[in-house]
């Protein structure tokens, strides 16, 4: 869970983020090797069956968020801050630009699904960039060369443009690789507006919202919602180079924000 060279650097510029090449820290490369080898269709179906009954815990959003102090994301080359520090950074950047409170809340909670790691799942099954499974992998997925060892290579249908899906079927019908995005979406889908839910569900899906891949699987509503994901992304990504947040000072505001949208406890 640690890296010998610090990844967090105050004052980083936008061009300094998301560098995935030979200079990428070994822990990040090793993460994607595992992720791309093991994110199969079979695995994704099993994870949805395991987690989406939401029968693993019942607790408040705030208490869950404080649990994430224990996590530093091995897939992220840009920060070695705790997860709660990153969540606070993101929410504060959104707030500073005057966006609605639901937008701020999306920033505050967008990574809470990473609690799956604290509950026993390996990081390769929790964090990192996401992508559709059950169809051909885009070469624009970071470290796409690692897919060569994925067992789904041997399933011809999965190696076609649409795979097990149909043209313009809509992303609701597409399995995106399992991780914290998909899990948290199902936890909070009854409490937040569709735009916030799209930010949560697809913020790690860089092949779609950054690279413009898989548009042939999207419907008109997906294209509308993806614009909100793109609005959210700079806050998630570029706030990592800013000053560390004062968690104690921000706590009253953030607790009030959570209480505005969520009951005292929800199912996880």
What residue ranges belong to the model's regions?
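Residues that form generic nucleotide/phosphate-binding pockets
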Residues: 30-34, 50-51, 64-71, 93, ...
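Non-catalytic interface/linker regions that flank or bridge core catalytic/transmembrane domains
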Residues: 1-60, 70, 268
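Charged phosphate-binding loop/patch that engages nucleotide di/tri-phosphates or the phosphate backbone
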Residues: 252-268
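Short secondary-structure junctions and interdomain/linker hinges
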Residues: 71-75, 207, 236-239, 264-268
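Alpha-helix initiation and N-capping motif
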Residues: 44, 58-65, 193, 222-225, ...
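Charged, low-complexity, helix/coiled-coil-prone segments
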Residues: 23-54, 119-135, 143-147, 167-168, ...
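Divalent metal-dependent catalytic cores for phosphoryl transfer on phosphate-bearing substrates
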Residues: 79-249
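Active-site flanking loop/helix segments enriched in acidic
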Residues: 49-85, 166-171
